[in-house]
Amino acid sequence: VTEEAIQEGNLPVPYGPELIWLWKFAKKLLKGREEVRGRPEPVGRIDWYFSLKGEDENAEIELKGRRRGDPLDLLVAEMMIFANSTWGGWLEERDVAGIYRSQRMGRVKMTSVPGPHDGIGVPYYAWSTSPLRRYVDMVNQRQIIATLKGEKAPYRNNDSELFSIISTFDSNYSAFNDFQSRMDRYWSMRWIEQEGINELKATVVKGDLVRIEGLPMAQRVPGLPELPRGQSVLMKVLNLDYLSLVMECSLIKVLNESHEEDLEEEEIEAEVEAPEAVPPEAPQAEGAEPGNAGQA
């Protein structure tokens, strides 16, 4: 299923005409969100992940990627956003309690109060489409289903149990993200060693935060010169510490490249959250700026 085939109106797969219609609808939804956000969402960004080929310590680490913005990827993402936004607004219209994910001034939070999500570009956003994967989605679906049946919803506005669910979920969600970022970091470092890589290209995200190109890895770089967002730099790998998950690097040079468009994406969530898990005491080589960057 390619964009070219869809635009030509020739998709020789089951339900081809339906998929073409849904793709056009998804593109319209995306355009509307981009107008609200005030900027387009970059396409073509790759989500990197690892798989192991073999067993034990001799297993080969394989780096793989999934490109965002492909037709089916776009279709699923936009349908989920559309459903979560619509159902969130539907609960608010009927004064039924729900759990919302909102973003104002760059800060993302879970709340029982309906509010816009600036990063996505929607007036409401209530996670509801993945009840088998997230407990919050199941809570919202129970609220929706009960209301549709004309029954009393399990939770009321200002329900202390609902606040407890939000608090517990926030804590667990943060712990999961922290664990995931550390695993991404560990396997990125292992892959760097396996491939014998001594130099890495990185992109400045903000301040001393950089992201390694082609790996799901980011870290703070104490002492990094002030550089514009999106600036590409070349880093030298000096040392890898798997126990503390610290990669010591030095700045080789600032490259004549910029990738600001790739950094505009917030993944519809905060991009800088994961790097905070990196130990702040990462060693710095004398006369050099350790750096790395990764990822969204």
What role is predicted for each listed range?
Residues 213, 242-272:
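OB-fold/S1-family single-stranded nucleic acid-binding modules
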Residues 236, 257-258, 271, 275, ...:
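Compositionally biased, intrinsically disordered low-complexity segments
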